[in-house]
A protein has these predicted regions:
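Bacterial N-terminal signal peptides
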Residues: 7-17
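Short, solvent-exposed coil/turn linker segments
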Residues: 14, 185, 190-193, 198-199, ...
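Mature extracellular "passenger" or substrate-interacting domains of secreted, surface-exposed proteins
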Residues: 51-52, 205, 310
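N-terminal capping segments
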Residues: 23-162, 320-332
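...with weaker cross-activation on analogous glycine-rich loops/strands in unrelated enzymes
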Residues: 119-264
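Positively charged n-region of N-terminal signal peptides that target proteins for export
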Residues: 1-5
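Low-complexity, Gly/Ser/Thr/Pro-rich intrinsically disordered linker/tail segments
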Residues: 253-332
Length: 332
């Protein structure tokens, strides 16, 4: 079991004006929910394997999809799932954070605010036939709750915005290459400017976080400026990570929990705490849930095939823009 020590920043970072950023709303923090997220993270096993494939292998007898389906454990007559994080192995990042969300919602919902039908629609449909998914349906990116959370771009942020369960805030360091800049005024912030950006002081442990990796120094790629995956196999594409934000370590590096991979040793990868310098992040979207009771709206508003067309387009059709990201995430 993971035991987390949360180290917060001692001093607030200085605010820095930046065209492509938004702020957290002062005072809007549901402490009971944030604590539920941290308790949920603590309930997951350590490691368990990192695997995105759908077929069994000598290393992984079950896929992450099948394992998560078994971990959800909900029968037709059940009012809510009996979710078991220890069964949800192996895993990958978006499945890990979605699992943490489910576990947090179960911990928080002590008086049945989330209806049985909402729980049915929150369940990921991953192509496996069971009593809830009788037809063995598989939600593609942008479909229903899981299809949104698993999508390229800020999928989970879009889900929260659509259900009005919280709000999102974001910052973008800017594109380093002129070809990927969306306006003539767009600048690529220096390391010092980016590390002092006000967004780092606004984040709270228990926020969900979508990282767009900065690969300019490590891979000579400006892909951190890209949202989604287009139809050109030769083009640069999004490289991201879905995580739960935990605070900062003693060096001021971002500390987070997720299923972390791929690695050279996938069997011993998976769930755990990791950290990275702020300079490794080129764009970030934080999601703060303030009204978890509104996930009950999934009962009527998130049927299994309810499609967000923008997230669907980010899966092999076209890249998104910052303007679109702000709109879809409800950021003004």
């Amino acid at each position: 079991m993971i035991r987390i020590v949360y180290t917060l920043m001692i001093a607030a970072c200085a605010a820095l004006a930046m065209p492509l950023s938004s702020s957290a709303k002062d005072g809007e923090l549901n402490r009971a929910w944030q604590n539920a997220v941290l308790a949920a993270v603590d309930s997951f096993p350590q490691n368990g394997g990192y695997y995105t494939g759908r077929k069994s292998t000598p290393e992984f007898k079950k896929s992450a999809w099948r394992a998560f389906n078994e971990a959800y454990n909900m029968r037709l007559a059940d009012p809510r799932p009996n979710f078991d994080p220890k069964k949800a192995t192996p895993s990958f990042c978006s499945l890990a954070t979605y699992g943490a969300f489910i576990q947090a919602l179960l911990i928080w919902d002590t008086d049945g605010k989330i209806s049985r039908m909402a729980w049915f629609n929150i369940k990921p449909l991953v192509g496996i036939t069971d009593v809830v998914n009788e037809k063995g349906l598989n939600q593609r990116d942008g479909e229903g709750c899981w299809g949104r959370a698993n999508a390229n771009g800020p999928g989970f942020a879009v889900l929260v915005a659509e259900l009005k369960a919280g709000y999102n805030f974001t910052a973008f360091r800017g594109a380093k290459t002129e070809a990927l800049r969306e306006s003539k005024d767009e600048k690529y912030l220096t390391d010092e400017q980016w590390c002092k950006h006000s967004i780092w002081a606004e984040a709270e442990p228990g926020d969900f976080m979508k990282i767009f990796w900065n690969r300019n120094e490590t891979a000579g790629s400006d892909s951190g400026a890209i949202i989604g995956v287009d139809d050109n196999p030769a083009a640069e594409q999004e490289h991201g990570h879905s995580v739960v934000f935990l605070g900062y370590d003693d060096n001021g590096d971002v500390k987070y929990w997720s299923s972390n991979g791929p690695t050279d040793d996938p069997v011993n990868a998976g769930y755990g705490i990791a950290s990275c310098p702020r300079t490794r992040i080129q764009r970030v979207v934080f999601t703060r849930i303030t009204n978890p009771e509104n996930f009950d709206r999934a009962a009527s508003k998130m049927k299994f095939n309810n499609l967000n067309k923008w997230l669907d387009a980010l899966n092999g059709k076209r890249h998104g823009t910052t303007k679109e990201l702000l709109k879809e995430c409800g950021i003004k």
